[in-house]
UniProtKB/Swiss-Prot annotation:
There is a cross-link at K149 (Glycyl lysine isopeptide (Lys-Gly) (interchain with G-Cter in ATG12)). This is Autophagy protein 5. Present with 606 molecules/cell in log phase SD medium. Small amount of ATG5-ATG12 conjugate is enough to perform normal autophagy. It is found in: Preautophagosomal structure membrane. Conjugated with ATG12. The ATG5-ATG12 conjugate forms a complex with several units of ATG16. The ATG12-ATG5 conjugate also associates with ATG3. Involved in cytoplasm to vacuole transport (Cvt) and autophagic vesicle formation. Autophagy is essential for maintenance of amino acid levels and protein synthesis under nitrogen starvation. Required for selective autophagic degradation of the nucleus (nucleophagy). Also required for mitophagy, which eliminates defective or superfluous mitochondria in order to fulfill cellular energy requirements and prevent excess ROS production. One of its GO terms (cellular component) is membrane. It is a peripheral membrane protein. The keyword Transport applies. Conjugated to ATG12; which is essential for autophagy. Conjugation with ATG12 involves ATG7 as an E1-like activating enzyme and ATG10 as an E2-like conjugating enzyme. It comes from Saccharomyces cerevisiae (strain ATCC 204508 / S288c). The lineage of its organism: Eukaryota, Fungi, Dikarya, Ascomycota, Saccharomycotina.
Amino acid sequence: MNDIKQLLWNGELNVLVSIDPSFLMKGSPREIAVLRIRVPRETYLVNYMPLIWNKIKSFLSFDPLTDSEKYFWFEHNKTPIPWNYPVGVLFDCLAGKSATFTTSFENQVKDVLTFLRIHLVMGDSLPPTIIPIASSKTQAEKFWFHQWKQVCFILNGSSKAIMSLSVNEARKFWGSVITRNFQDFIEISNKISSSRPRHIPLIIQTSRTSGTFRISQPTISMTGVNPTLKDIEGDILDVKEGINGNDVMVICQGIEIPWHMLLYDLYSKLRSFDGFLYITLVPIKGGDKASSEL
């Protein structure tokens, strides 16, 4: 199982970051406004903000680290996107709303998104539901650790396991994300995980035709059961809208997942670096209800 986890851990995406002209002084070279980077699927976009600021610092029209009157966020095709989801999760959802797929997800994304294209913008106020990009170097770490507290509680019924980590273990845990140390990550995360979870930390994301994300976090009990995805289809899909499993593909970590997959097996193998299992629902061509409602 660790072989699968390490493949996911080592997975990377091409990310093209374009900088809004409002950040730069007049006369700045056009090429300075575009940055191409390779980013792990299992990280946050904001972890690369120091790299972005460093590239454009000589051409900035203001100091973003001290300006408290401006808010910064990312967009894709003029739609705000949250930095607080793993990069791979964002890619899966953005690829999913770029087309309606008729063949395998893996083949289609090659044509739809060669790069994860994001735009760094700023404004006097934030779009709804978007967490601003802060100058604090600990912003991502604090958010990520809070995610793991939630995960620990969902799995075990309490946060005792993660709160019992020593200061050095907690630093080592986050450090494993920054330095890409897989062994350290597995060592610490296994202390939090449970072989007999009470519930599964699950987040479902779907792209609406408006370009916004629909996020749900169903509560899936695992007490005495180990359901398949098909068994919990009603929790995964918005059945009130008449959508069923024939209308959508289930995508996790860029992989198309069959409905007969056991939920605990899926969680054990494909959970993300923040402890949650992210499932992306992608409309299938011919699924009229999915195409109109998602």
